[in-house]
A protein has these predicted regions:
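Domain-level signal for soluble alpha/beta catalytic cores
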Residues: 1-401
């Protein structure tokens, strides 16, 4: 994995808005409706190539496929794993809303958030296994193809964390969370290894880490939530066993939605568990109004030797285009605490979380935000290394992922 050795590197967090025609294909596929499979595969490959080219053009250093061939960052597993053929008819769980008038105004049933916009939600009814590993191989091949002839610094592919699958997909088959998690870990390990073996950095997506508290375990003591969280991360480490930490980055966020977030778990209360994950880099939401202050916890929490922080420096749900000077300030705050070589700049989260959602941030605005992030990283680099810091460039030398 690259470090910011002579300037602040930039990346993003995986999902990008899908072109409208591809979005329609993904929605049909997700719902089990007829679609042209060969046209879909060709369009995904083309879209990935376009997305990679655009990432390089705006100056992003560590690029990805944008998850353009997936219905979502979690539920894509239903097309690939056995044991997920049933449909979950229940609404998305959640506590009674703390802002009931607001909840009513946006048509959320009191006590439960509907699954609208999440696509088809599967239900686990049998032992996990692979039924369609070729889709993993397709994702790898599409990114490999898109990178041909493109000069880039690094590349990554996202995959879902074992705990996030449990967060989204309940089971009528497994009799305990432990059995579910460890069985799934043994299965997902194959995907994790394939990404790393292809030469890419593996990004493991785990918004369940904080979200399980206020979506599933809001009515238990905080200590009990931490026990559940520790089990999920233990199972994830089981899946990551044997994979070099320097090939893994771990993404944590509080739900990629423009919502009050008034009861989000503070990072300070879970950061010790987050740092137990066998990854070199930790991608953490840090730009939005609820979590922008949390840079300060790193004054008291020591980032372990050799680790990297990938803080969010632009908001992924707001159409405000951050000023490059603000981005630079955020980067410098982190760099002066954990070391400039240990910081890579990124958005808070992805910009195309679910294919069933219209993009929360229009692609035109997203690319403008990315340009501000790149410009901010250049300003921060000059402040941290001096005016001779290497400038980010779309034609910079390609190094190993």
């Amino acid at each position: 994995m690259q470090r910011s050795t002579d300037r602040i590197l930039t990346t993003h967090v995986g999902s990008l808005p899908r072109p409208p025609d591809l979005q329609q294909m993904l929605q049909a596929k997700d719902r089990g409706e007829p679609y042209n499979a060969s046209a879909f595969e060709a369009r995904v490959k083309q879209a990935v190539a376009e997305a990679v080219r655009k990432q390089v053009e705006v100056g992003i250093d560590v690029v990805s496929d944008g998850e353009l061939g997936k219905s979502s960052f979690t539920n894509y597993v239903k097309d690939r794993l056995s044991g997920l053929d049933a449909v979950n008819p229940d609404p998305y769980p959640g506590p009674p809303p703390i802002f009931p008038e607001y909840a009513s105004a946006i048509r959320i049933e009191p006590g439960r958030v509907t699954a609208a916009g999440l696509g088809v939600r599967p239900l686990n009814t049998d032992k996990f296994g692979w039924k369609n590993f070729s889709e993993v191989e397709r994702d790898i091949a599409n990114l490999e193809s898109a990178l041909q002839g493109v000069e880039y610094t690094g590349a990554f592919l996202p995959a879902v964390a074992v705990g996030q699958v449990l967060f989204m997909i309940p089971s009528t088959y497994y009799t305990s969370d432990r059995a579910y998690l460890y069985d799934l870990a043994d299965v997902l390990k194959r995907e994790y290894c394939a990404i790393v073996d292809a030469g890419f950095v593996l990004q493991v997506d785990a918004p369940d880490v904080p979200m399980m508290r206020n979506r599933q375990l809001w009515n238990v003591p905080f200590s009990e939530y931490r026990k559940h969280l520790a089990l999920r991360l233990e199972a994830l480490n089981h899946a990551l066993e044997g994979i070099p930490e320097e090939r893994v980055r771990f993404h944590v966020c509080w739900g990629n939605t423009e919502a009050p977030h008034a009861e989000d778990v503070p990072l300070k209360d879970i950061v010790d568990l987050v740092l137990t994950v066998h990854a070199q880099a930790y991608s953490i939401e840090a730009a939005n109004p609820r979590h922008a202050h949390e840079w300060a916890i790193w004054q008291d929490v020591k980032l372990p030797e050799g680790k990297i922080l990938i803080p969010g420096v632009i908001d992924s749900v707001s159409t405000f285009v951050e000023h490059p000077d603000l981005v630079a300030q955020r980067i410098v705050q982190y760099a002066r605490i954990v070391g400039r070589e240990n910081v890579i700049a990124a958005p808070d989260c992805g910009f195309g979380t679910f294919s069933a959602w219209a993009p929360r941030v229009h692609p035109e605005i997203m690319w403008a935000k990315f340009r501000s992030m790149v410009d901010g990283a250049r300003i921060a680099s000059a402040r941290l290394w001096g005016s001779c810091a290497s400038a980010p460039s779309a034609t910079g030398a390609r190094t190993s992922p």
